[in-house]
Amino acid sequence: MPTASPFSATDFDDWIDYEARQFWSSGLRPEDRYAHSLNFSLFVGGPCVLGAQKLGALSIHAGTVPSERLLAILRQFKVTAIWTTPSYAWYLGETALKEGIDPRRDLGVQRIFVAGEPGGSIAETRQRIEALWGADVYDYYGLSDIFGSCAGMCTEKDGLHWAEDHIH
């Protein structure tokens, strides 16, 4: 049974603020185009999209569309940043290659934010995804039942930074 994640309006606002700050520390800027490719059901992804919007980035709610459709979205909207899981980032890159698309050359993704499973903080895994995509990979960590994204990696990639002002 999935975990329900009830949040107050204040919790949600704090979370959106934290996402915007964390995205900034990971290099996302207002001129970026961000695609969120995780579902919005009981995974609480809404604040991630709203955090990118608060920062000024164009935000695309891609959800869990088929991989071929997501690749088309990445090309059509010239997406520069994507949020997904580490395993799906790898799978999507491999799918692109099978479709004759070189993620490094043909897509223009510069940042991949990963969460939801181990991998993003494992240097070897992160480096393999970065090599496949030609993009920087940043790990995010969260617990749906306390605050969603509780920590994230900055451009130094030397660990995760806690949302200390929101986690008590």
Question: What are the functions of these language-model segments?
Answer:
Residues 12-25, 39, 92-103:
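Short, composition-biased local secondary-structure segments
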Residues 7-8, 36-37, 58-59, 114:
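A generic structural signal for short
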Residues 2-5, 27-35, 60-62, 138:
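Short secondary-structure capping/junction motifs at helix and strand boundaries
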Residues 16-57:
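Conserved AMP-binding loop of ANL adenylate-forming enzymes
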Residues 1-14:
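Conserved AMP-binding A3 loop
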Residues 55-168:
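Active-site glycine/GP-rich loop and adjacent strand/helix microenvironment
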